[in-house]
From Swiss-Prot:
Organism: Legionella pneumophila subsp. pneumophila (strain Philadelphia 1 / ATCC 33152 / DSM 7513)
Protein name as it appears in the record: DNA-directed RNA polymerase subunit beta'
InterPro entries in the cross-refs: DNA-dir_RpoC_beta_prime, DNA-dir_RpoC_beta_prime_bact, RNA_pol_asu, RNA_pol_N, RNA_pol_Rpb1_1, RNA_pol_Rpb1_3, RNA_pol_Rpb1_3_sf, RNA_pol_Rpb1_4
EC number(s) recorded for this UniProt protein: 2.7.7.6
Function: DNA-dependent RNA polymerase catalyzes the transcription of DNA into RNA using the four ribonucleoside triphosphates as substrates.
Enzyme class of the recorded protein, top EC level: transferase
GO cellular component: DNA-directed RNA polymerase complex
Quaternary structure, from the entry: The RNAP catalytic core consists of 2 alpha, 1 beta, 1 beta' and 1 omega subunit. When a sigma factor is associated with the core the holoenzyme is formed, which can initiate transcription.
Single GO MF descriptor: DNA binding
Residues binding Zn(2+) 2: C808, C882, C889, C892
Binding locations of Zn(2+) 1: C70, C72, C85, C88
Lineage: Bacteria, Pseudomonadati, Pseudomonadota, Gammaproteobacteria, Legionellales
Length: 1401
């Protein structure tokens, strides 16, 4: 018998599952869940507080109210378990069954489920091919629908109003069947033959031509196939039976004073039951049709309200005019089931308290108040007390702890030793917001935090609070120690740079310690060791800043000693350097940047342990000497420059001068405003400069008595210079002038604040300042919410990106080049490729062997090698081109930035990427910059002046040579680069059309040389051949006017706008041609395109008809409208726009194909641009007239070249230039925003997000697959289907990548659980239920929600081994694994056991 019990025990083990399916519930299924019908609307008896029988809380249906106790009290006790009381019908069980037992309501008339009716697109409507409006008229009893036309002329699904129905009855009698209400709809749904419909639609699809029809058919087809494949029946969308939620999930609690607090669901259920019972009664009484109809309609409405209140009509409200919370509201939104209870739960063994600074702690420690520790570790203390025999029972132990006996504290010390705890500070924006520490017991009530981890937590000690959590299991402690310990998180996962960097006081102390002072006590002395110098300093014979010489051991492995010039402070600092670290790293003034570099190189050279010790030592030293320095801010330290008054007076005079010019009409108001703003910005700079030079240096006497200048020891200057706190801009406001302020609309007020804070502001100045200050606060509040929402969307889209294999074997990648803007290298190549894997061998011209082989992970050494050889582009593997089906491969991702080695399998790189991009979001600005105002007014560039010596190279520039030997550019996308002697690119500039280039290709240039010039305010039309000018359609007074310039007296020919021309000139297209003296066409070199140039509106022609024109002459010029400047969106909104893949307003028009351009006939307000690919193939594009088109007739364009200027549209880039170009565009644009704020983020994080935006394919060719043309499918799904088709030798489907914004991509994910918990819960669940979706639980969110370990990190291996074990069981290899027991197994075991018993007898 024992083995039978063994089998049954195994049966009770936790169930293991790999997927969750959602489907429609059939009426039979609902009845099978139920433990009884709810017949009455009563809840509980208000006198006895006992549930009413057959009511909403009935104990007979839902189970007993108290454990193992029936309602009437006849049976109590465990021994009656399972007995059903004869008197009250209650089964004796645990009271918690009231949380899981459901009931049901038998509806007297069928009711439509509102989700499938009203959630767009209406599923019922799609199936029946009726409009939602019509279906609603039937359901809410306003019209009849023909269910069965019989032999009549009526159509199935046709609507009849009352008159039409009566007429039809008169005409046909009983030959047809027309009804109203949900029954009619249910019968229509029943009549649908899914297979038949699918076949018909599949046949109809290829024959239709209309776009809308194809769309409609595809939608219906997909829905019908979903129903057919999932086994859902359409009529189940109409309900005969309504399930009732278990009573403990909709509680009714008596409050004191005889009132009750109840869940809204009870009200909604009561309303349904009341109406249902009334309807039953009316049907029994054979009431008049109109009354029954009304009751049925009311029943439908009350069920609607129960399922989703407010989706149709007005929401039903409770007593306090507040809409009742329906079942749908329970699960959606931030307070819904998904986000409140499944994704975020409260945890026990936790506490929170205020944090204070713990400057004496080691990096891996935190101070934990004894009171908190006692409470948090209680169970551990109890067990220890019992184990040591100090307490006999847990109760006794509890008493001991409550009395706080002295032995308890000893045991607490014991329990806490080596038991890490987690500290978390909200908001947790990235993974460094939770770290593990070893607790040190302290008196007091505040948690002590190590100062160096403040940066990671973004914590300060102005009243911040932190939460403590205790990892209980051994595994949890192990993970906390090895992965989350603060000492293991020295590098930031966002950029791979150290995040444990001293700041504020520590920086100030180290800076003060390492400064030099002229003529300090003991200058010029020589000491035998750093220790000796320190002793002399401690004894008071040396100043800490004195310049001295010290005998130091040589570096680079050389033996012997040498003298080093240094200061006493630096010698003191040398004592804490790790062994083997060169002294010259710190033999300089230590600012924050220098310290960060030192820590970084320490980590790379000596590893983790040394770095942690070094960082701690730096902190202790910094604090010590910051205290010794006595640096403090006094009002005298804000030194106002002497020449401030004269500078301001000068500016005032300039402004007066401009005002008088404006009054005499020489300048416009706009010009006057701009000039005034410019003057004041310049003045502000001058005052700031003068002030900084005064504060930054001081005059002292050196040892020889000469006057010399040295860096000042002014505390304000020291704080700013060291990077401890404050900036030049802030000092400027304290001691210079405050400068220009912005008005509420973002424009700049032209009266500046000339005072500074030391002098004080007058009322007017104060008033101007208030606006900016307030806007700052409002901005900050908005920014936090927006940034949080962006992070949430990013996490959602990338949550299932995990490293799942080592190498996907692809040889593609993206090309990395240094980022060069204008003459500056913004990001050198070695920074961009560090930590990436090379995709294809890197060669240099002088060698045949590759410098770096494909598959190499580029670390610091390799990168230096690339730099040395002058490599300027490398093809690296990227997440975007990774071929792994689910997740990513380690090679495509490269280095784990926070650890410094190749990423491990199972690393959740998607979440890390999302956090890295989202966390700095709060530092980004919120505003859109308006052009105008000193902040963003860049003068229009009109030349290229180079910064470095090198050789000039021209890239895809078409030029013609002017007679004065200069080159003139006649191409648009041309660029010029300057390369150094190794052939490395140093500078890159765009060369506009019409620029005059004064240097030849491949000619050497010097720094400072101007190599190209152009007029920034006009677009020229350049002649590419020489000849005589011939006017075509240029008729004076009709298509052109002559305007005389007042100043010069010259007359110009100007083209008139077509709208303003007379009827005769409307269709004329003015152009100029170049012809020979005989009047024959001249063709462009090497083509059969005549040299002719169409002239747009407002073009100014420089030559008269018939005049001679040379090569490179400017025939006409088109003034550039500076008025139509677009607002530049910056900061957070820009990042959001990029990731949401939003189409910009007035986006650039790009050439769809490569070919020759010509202009067709103009249509209303638009120009027709035709690109001829070949004789018989061309592409047309309509472009609004006001857009500036940057190509000319007869010009050759490449696919993807910009035809009309504007912001680029990412969808166009993907379509025309491919995935690589798109990736580059998004990465660079996002990086531009972050770089402006000085935030470093590694490119690969953005690439991971872009990969997720490119998950879908649009099917272009269906082949033999189940997909339809134009359908959007997950790439992995398409590949899987193709694998299947290939195996069967059928035609595979093909698709093109499509870009989705992050919100859309999250909602379009395969996992319905993840999508439903993100946004639009109702829509996602409706769609999933109808198609019977199966969630494979691949992502992180889904697994958190079903309560399993996430398939990432340590959980990744757990899931792998679990699946492997299951596979072994399936193969029959491992018998020790869990059996699945069938009923026959149990029968067999039982009979064997009984037989054995018989034999014994």
């Amino acid at each position: 018998m024992s083995d039978l019990l063994g089998i049954l025990k195994q049966q009770g083990q936790s169930e293991e599952f790999d997927a969750i399916k959602i489907a429609l519930a059939s009426p039979e299924l609902i009845r099978s869940w139920s433990y009884g019908e709810v017949k009455k609307p009563e809840t509980i008896n208000y006198r006895t507080f006992k549930p009413e029988r057959d009511g909403l809380f009935c104990a007979k249906t839902f189970g007993p109210v108290k454990d193992y106790e029936c309602l009437c009290g006849k049976y109590k006790r465990l021994k009656h378990r399972g007995v059903i009381c004869e008197k009250c019908g209650v089964e004796l069980a645990l009271a918690k069954v009231r949380r899981e037992r459901m009931g049901h309501i038998e509806l007297a008339s069928p009711v439509a489920h509102i989700w499938f009716l009203k959630s767009l697109p209406s599923r019922i409507g799609l199936l029946l091919d009726m409009t939602l409006r019509d279906i609603e008229r039937v359901l809410y009893f306003e019209a009849f629908v023909v269910v069965d036309p019989g032999m009549t002329e009526l159509e199935r699904g046709q609507l009849l109003n009352d008159e039409a129905y009566l007429d039809a009855m008169e005409q046909y009698g009983d030959e047809f069947d027309a009804r109203m209400g949900a029954e009619a709809i249910r019968d229509l749904l029943r009549q649908i033959d899914l297979e038949d419909e699918i076949r018909n639609l599949r046949e109809e699809l290829p024959t239709t031509n209309s776009e809308t029809k194809i769309k409609k058919i595809t939608k219906r087809l997909k829905l019908l196939e979903a129903f057919y494949e999932s086994g859902n029946k359409p009529e189940w969308m109409i309900m005969d039976v309504l399930p009732v939620l278990p009573p403990d999930l909709r509680p009714l609690v008596p409050l004191d004073g005889g009132r009750f607090a109840t869940s809204d669901l009870n009200d909604l259920y009561r309303r349904v039951i009341n109406r249902n019972n009334r309807l039953k009664r009316l049907l029994d009484l054979n009431a008049p049709d109109i009354i029954v109809r009304n009751e049925k309609r009311m029943l439908q409405e009350s069920v609607d309200a129960l399922l989703d209140n407010g989706r149709r009509g007005r929401a039903i409200t409770g007593t306090n005019k507040r809409p009742l919370k329906s079942l749908a509201d329970m699960i959606k939104g931030k307070q819904g089931r998904f986000r409140q209870n499944l994704l975020g739960k409260r945890v026990d063994y936790s506490g929170r308290s205020v944090i204070v600074v713990g400057p004496t702690l080691k990096l891996h420690q935190c101070g934990l108040p004894k009171k908190m520790a006692l409470e948090l570790f209680k169970p551990f203390i109890f067990s220890k007390l019992e184990f040591r025999g100090l307490a006999t029972t847990i109760k006794a132990a509890k008493k001991m702890v409550e009395r706080e006996e002295s032995v308890v504290w000893d045991i607490l010390d014991d329990v806490i030793r080596e038991h890490p705890i987690l500290l978390n500070r909200a908001p947790t924006l990235h993974r460094l917001g939770i770290q593990a520490f070893e607790p040190v017991l302290i008196e007091g009530k505040a948690i002590q935090l190590h100062p160096l981890v403040c940066t990671a937590y973004n914590a300060d000690f102005d009243g911040d609070q932190m939460a403590v959590h205790v990892p209980l299991t051994l595994e949890a402690q192990l993970e906390a120690r090895s992965l989350m310990m603060s000492t293991n998180n020295i590098l930031s996962p966002a950029s791979g740079e150290p995040i444990i960097v001293p700041s504020q006081d520590v920086v100030l102390g180290l800076y003060y310690l390492t400064r030099e002072k002229v003529n300090a006590l003991g200058e010029g002395k020589i000491y035998s060791s750093a220790q000796e110098a320190q002793n002399f300093y401690e004894a008071g014979h040396l100043d800490i800043h004195a310049k001295i010489k010290i005998r130091m051991p040589k570096e680079d492995g050389e033996t012997g000693y040498h003298l080093v010039e240094t200061t006493v402070g630096r010698a003191i600092l040398a004592e804490i350097l790790p062994k083997g670290m060169p002294f010259d790293y710190i033999n300089r003034t230590m600012t924050k940047k220098v310290i960060s570099k030192v820590i970084d190189s320490c980590y790379r050279k000596f590893g983790l342990k040394e770095t942690v010790i070094f960082a701690d030592q730096l902190m202790y030293t910094g604090f010590k000497y910051a205290t010794r320095s006595g640096a403090s801010i006094g009002i005298e330290d804000m030194e106002i420059p002497d020449d401030k008054a004269s500078i301001i007076e000068h500016a005032d005079n300039e402004v007066r001068e401009i005002e008088s010019q404006f009054r005499s009409g020489l300048v416009t108001n706009g010009e006057r405003y701009n000039k005034v703003i410019d003057i004041w910005s310049r003045t502000n700079e001058l005052v700031a400069k003068s002030m900084m030079s005064k504060i930054a240096t001081e005059e002292v006497t050196d040892a020889k008595g000469n006057k010399v200048r040295q860096e000042s020891f002014n505390p304000i200057f020291m704080m700013a210079d060291s990077g401890a706190r404050g900036s030049a801009a802030q000092i400027r406001q304290l001691a210079g002038m405050r400068g220009l302020m912005a008005a509420p609309d973002g424009s700049i007020i032209e009266t500046p604040i000339t005072a500074n804070f030391r002098e004080g502001l007058n009322v007017f100045q104060y008033f101007i300042s208030t606006h900016g200050a307030r806007k700052g606060l409002a901005d900050t509040a908005l920014k936090t919410a927006n940034s949080g929402y962006l992070t949430r969307r990013l996490v959602d889209v990338a949550q299932d990106v995990v490293i799942t294999e080592d190498d996907c074997g692809t040889d593609t990648g993206i090309l990395m080049q240094p980022l060069i803007e204008g003459g500056d290298i913004v990001e050198p190549l070695h920074e961009r490729v560090l930590g990436r894997v090379v995709a294809s061998d890197v060669y240099i011209p002088t060698q045949t062997e590759p410098v770096v082989k494909a598959g190499t992970l580029l670390d610091e050494e390799w990168v230096e090698k690339l730099e040395k050889h002058g490599v300027d582009q490398v093809m690296v593997r990227s997440p975007i081109t990774c071929q792994t089906r689910f997740g990513l491969c380690a090679k495509c991702y490269g280095r784990d930035l926070a650890r410094g080695h190749l990423v491990n399998t199972g690393e959740a790189v998607g979440i890390i990427a999302a956090q890295s991009i989202g966390e700095p979001g709060t530092q980004l600005t919120m505003r859109t910059f308006h052009i105008g105002g000193a902040a963003s007014r860049a003068t229009a560039a009109n030349n290229i002046q180079i910064k470095t010596k090198g050789v000039i190279r021209l890239h895809n520039i078409k030029t013609v040579t002017h007679e004065n030997k200069n080159l003139v550019a006649v191409s648009r996308s041309g660029e010029v680069t300057i390369v150094d002697e190794f052939g490395r690119e140093r500078e890159r500039y765009k060369v506009p059309y019409g620029a005059v280039i004064s240097a030849q290709d491949n000619s050497p240039v010097e720094a400072g040389q101007v190599i190209a010039t152009w007029d920034p305010h006009t677009h020229p039309v350049i002649s590419e051949v020489s000849g005589r000018l011939k006017f075509v359609d240029l008729i004076d007074g009709i298509t052109m006017n002559r305007q005389t310039d007042e100043l010069t007296g010259l007359s110009n020919i100007v083209i008139i706008d077509a709208k303003q021309r007379s009827a005769a000139g409307r269709d004329l297209r003015p152009m100029v041609k170049l012809v020979t003296d005989e009047g024959d066409d001249i063709y462009l070199a090497g083509t059969n395109v005549p040299a002719q140039y169409y002239l747009p509106v407002d073009a100014i022609v420089n030559f008269e008809d018939g005049s001679l024109v040379g090569i490179g002459d400017v025939i006409a010029r088109i003034p550039q409208e500076r008025s139509k400047t677009r607002d530049i969106t910056g900061g957070l909104p820009r990042v959001a726009d990029l990731f949401e893949a939003r189409k910009p307003k007035d986006s650039a028009v790009m050439a769809e194909v490569s070919g020759l351009v010509n202009f067709g006939k103009e249509t209303k307000g638009k120009r027709r641009l035709i690109i001829n690919v070949s004789e018989d193939q061309c592409h047309e594009e309509l472009i609004p007239k006001w857009r500036h088109i940057s190509v000319f007739e007869g010009e050759h364009v490449e696919r993807g070249e910009i035809i009309a200027e504007g912001a680029l549209n990412p969808h166009d880039i993907l379509r025309l230039l491919g995935v690589g170009a798109l990736a580059n565009y998004i990465v660079n644009e996002v990086q531009d925003v972050y770089r402006l704020q000085g935030v470093k983020i590694n490119d690969k994080h953005i690439e991971v997000i872009v990969r997720q935006m490119l998950r879908k394919r649009v099917i272009t060719f269906a082949g033999d697959s189940k997909f339809l043309v134009g359908e959007q499918v997950e790439e992995s799904a398409m590949l899987q289907e193709n694998d299947k088709l290939l195996a069967e030798g059928k035609q595979i489907a093909r698709g093109t990548p499509i870009l989705l914004g992050i919100t859309k991509a999250s909602l379009a994910t395969e996992s319905f659980i993840s999508a439903a918990s993100f946004q639009e819960t109702t829509r996602v669940l409706t769609e999933a239920a109808v198609s019977g979706k199966v969630d494979e639980l691949r992502g992180l969110k889904e697994n958190v929600m079903v309560g399993r370990l996430i398939p990432a990190g340590t959980g990744y291996t757990y899931h792998q081994s679990r699946k492997a074990k299951r596979a072994r069981v399936a193969a029959g290899g491992d018998s020790s694994a869990t059996h699945t027991v069938t009923a026959s197994d149990v029968e067999h075991a039982l009979s064997e056991a009984l037989n054995a018993d018989n034999h014994e007898h």
